[in-house]
Amino acid sequence: MMSFLPYFSAETWTLLALLITLIVVYGYWPYGVFTKMGIPGPKPLPYFGTMLEYKKGFTNFDTECFQKYGRIWGIYDGRQPVLCIMDKSMIKTVLIKECYNIFTNRRNFHLNGELFDALSVAEDDTWRRIRSVLSPSFTSGRLKEMFGIMKQHSSTLLSGMKKQADKDQTIEVKEFFGPYSMDVVTSTAFSVDIDSLNNPSDPFVSNVKKMLKFDLFNPLFLLVALFPFTGPILEKMKFSFFPTAVTDFFYASLAKIKSGRDTGNSTNRVDFLQLMIDSQKGSDTKTGEEQTKGLTDHEILSQAMIFIFAGYETSSSTMSFLAYNLATNHHVMTKLQEEIDTVFPNKAPIQYEALMQMDYLDCVLNESLRLYPIAPRLERVAKKTVEINGIVIPKDCIVLVPTWTLHRDPEIWSDPEEFKPERFSKENKESIDPYTYMPFGAGPRNCIGMRFALIMIKLAMVEILQSFTFSVCDETEIPLEMDNQGLLMPKRPIKLRLEARRNTPSNTTATTLKSPTT
């Protein structure tokens, strides 16, 4: 070794020492942020920060930190400081009061590929403009118009489930709820009927499933987290978290549908796509100049694609968790079926107004969303340094609300792991702080399709429970283990037994039952 040393000059040794020093400093430099703020949290490792803790799962890590550090703590995703908050007043300030001025945007790695202008990642004025164009698609009047279309697909769902029930086999519930969600979304949004339940190999379904295969420890994700300066470089090189073949398929398919509208092949109903196209009228949206209202052609395709992705995954997962909760809590399912038999005796067709007035159905769905919020974390980025409740949050810091953990806080929810729909009864609902229950987010940047999803879920579940019951089987995993994904989903498919109901109450019997009020 000693004979090797002289071959390096003093300048070389100086440069090597400087390089090593820079590497060490780079690895440790960002991790003093929360110490200076007096914020507790797990000890970060050089370069990785606290990311390796995610091997436990997002939800487990967040809950562990809450139990150890209290309602405010700091973590590091690579070099990125993330302030986690479960204080109600801070949550309100971040999501509501200062949404437009400071906390407008979500975290964005800028590796979204063609989805760079989708509503979910759009920022500031671009987000406001796109949101204002899309909002009319989700008014009560529009949703009521879509209800008839939803019923067509819920009927197909029911037929498919009946075939499976007749075989007396266990079912992977998402294999039914996924196609139903896809069919409802494509038909209401673009007036395109896929019938994916009977065509499981349809490219729309197979491609959307490929989009969901996101690994937290994906090399691309790790590279950007550990070396943030590579993000803009990778973006310029067209790298994306989403498979290129998948996004190319959807953009080509949606462009073809839009082209048909542009050439006069219009639909009889005003759907999601048509409302976006109409926004272009009177606006020059193809020149790339500053937009004042209408959407560009590319923005239209991006919103259509994110609507497919979000509508498929969030709705089908919510329905799967709801079926699981009913199967593992038979007394709740029985009570819900009593309400269904009262409101719609003798398997009467589902009517929109009556469905919206079902109190216990609301309670059950809300409680399922409390236990399994599809977005287990809400994130916002501080556009400038701000002080909230005596805490100075630096510019570019991520502020994170751990929804999963918040929804299971024993100081807020008694027996938080128990499935108790009565928490959301009319008597109890008023006492629930809106900043402790946020399955769809909160504030101006909440989920725009929330009411659409709830109607679709309620309709399908009521029609299913008119004819069937869910029950656990040997293959049902209890409790569920969550996967390490951005959206909440079980690590393994939820498998249940579906059985035809016997002795469904007659019209006379059903109408004598009192509608549950808790």
Swiss-Prot record:
This is Cytochrome P450 3A27. Keywords: Endoplasmic reticulum, Heme, Iron, Membrane, Metal-binding, Microsome, Monooxygenase, Oxidoreductase. The keyword Cell cycle does not apply. The gene is cyp3a27. It is a peripheral membrane protein. InterPro entries: Cyt_P450 (IPR001128), Cyt_P450_CS (IPR017972), Cyt_P450_E_CYP3A (IPR008072), Cyt_P450_E_grp-II (IPR002402), Cyt_P450_sf (IPR036396), Cytochrome_P450_3A (IPR050705). It comes from Oncorhynchus mykiss. Heme binds at residue 447. Induction: P450 can be induced to high levels in liver and other tissues by various foreign compounds, including drugs, pesticides, and carcinogens.
